[in-house]
């Protein structure tokens, strides 16, 4: 999906840092009216594609430096991306961003950060493709030394959630006003 591509493009070597916000907003929009079961599936596909795109270089390394054949290196890279995508299933557990209050955004952002934390701890501190790592060299640089990458992840996710919620509220208010005027 385009949101997965935007996600990966926000990291080095591309460094289109603003795209992480668009990626998350598009993801939230695509999840908005899904059942929890479908939301978990969609989040899994999103994160699997993010990890496949973001760690595709591992395939080349396994071929060139691990002396593996193409098929085996593709299988190993796919399994790796599959495994590191599993903690993100937690993200599908929220109900709806647009139909809840702004305090609920903190809960949803916390689910994202918990998934990132679990990925980092369960898989030996694997830091690649953590949202906070996409924002070095930005306004968030003052947060890294005191609160760390997970705090940056939280602020980026919360900001994306806030803008998504504000935009959907604005659309619903505009649609309701149009219906009353008709």
Question: Where do the model's predicted regions map?
Answer:
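Membrane-embedded alpha-helical bundles of multi-pass enzymes
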Residues: 1-174
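Single conserved hydrophobic/aromatic residue that forms the stacking wall/gate
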Residues: 172-182
């Amino acid at each position: 999906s385009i949101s997965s591509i935007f996600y990966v493009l926000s990291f080095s070597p591309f460094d289109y840092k603003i795209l992480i916000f668009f990626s998350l907003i598009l993801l939230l929009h695509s999840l908005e009216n899904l059942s929890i079961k479908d939301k978990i599936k969609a989040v899994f596909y999103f994160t699997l594609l993010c990890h496949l795109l973001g760690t595709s270089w591992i395939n080349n390394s396994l071929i060139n430096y691990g002396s593996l054949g193409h098929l085996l290196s593709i299988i190993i890279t796919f399994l790796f991306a599959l495994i590191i995508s599993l903690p993100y299933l937690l993200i599908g557990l929220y109900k709806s961003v647009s139909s809840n209050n702004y305090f609920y955004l903190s809960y949803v952002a916390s689910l994202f950060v918990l998934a990132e934390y679990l990925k980092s701890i369960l898989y030996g501190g694997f830091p690649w493709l953590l949202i906070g790592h996409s924002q070095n060299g930005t306004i968030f640089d003052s947060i890294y030394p005191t609160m760390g990458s997970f705090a940056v992840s939280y602020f980026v996710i919360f900001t994306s959630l806030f803008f998504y919620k504000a935009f959907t509220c604005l659309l619903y208010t505009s649609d309701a006003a149009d219906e009353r005027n008709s």
